[in-house]
Amino acid sequence: MAFKFVVFAAALAYANAGLLGAPAVATYAAGPAVAYSARPAVSTAYINQAAPFLAHAAPLAVAHAAPYAVHAPAVGASHQSVVRSLGGNQAVSHYSKAVDSAFSSVRKFDTRITNDALLRAHAPVAVAHAAPVVVHLTAAHAPVVSSYAHAPLVSSYAAHAPLVSSYAAHAPLVSSYAAHAPVLSTAYAAHAPVVSSYAAPVVARTAAVGYSPAAVVSHTSFTGLGASYAW
């Protein structure tokens, strides 16, 4: 396409110059032998057309940067040792490891001790300990093993004897007085309950019916201080 454009531009240049119809060689007319004519002016035009050439633009040089190479080798070292005792009963092992790089540093240490407990067992030393005194110490007071009770106070207590009287309604006045009841000597300070007996009223039907007083009954009971009495 570029070559056609160059040819078209050259043809256009020829047309503008007016040289397309000009003869390639200049002609001379021979004059008569007698007459002399001045030499006509000869105009010579030379056109040197260089061969067309196509100029190609140089390709664009694209430079790619080489990748950044980081040369950072890591250096590692490890060490291990095992020390055993006579017979191999006990072993002590050491292990260490070191890794060094451009960005980090690591250290590791490991120590292990093993013992198979195969040593000779010594006889136990006979140690005589005195037998502990069998003494039972109790913080609480031991109960006294004895029967303890407040014995009734044998003392004469003048308690009022219960009034035992027979009462009849509008009957012939017959008063029966009972003898004093035996005084019960106890350790109870309260008065003995008064027990009063009342005879049933005498219903007199006729005068022929005789009247006899009811028997005097006295009941006494006491309960307290672990004792109970009744009669």
From Swiss-Prot:
Repeat as a keyword of this entry, yes or no, is: yes
Sorted alphabetically, which keywords does the UniProt record give?
Cuticle, Repeat, Signal
Superkingdom, according to UniProt?
Eukaryota
Is Signal one of the keywords? yes
Pfam (any one): Cuticle_3
* Described function: Component of the cuticle of Tenebrio molitor.
In Swiss-Prot or TrEMBL terms, this protein is called: Cuticle protein LPCP-23
Q: Which gene encodes it?
A: LPCP-23
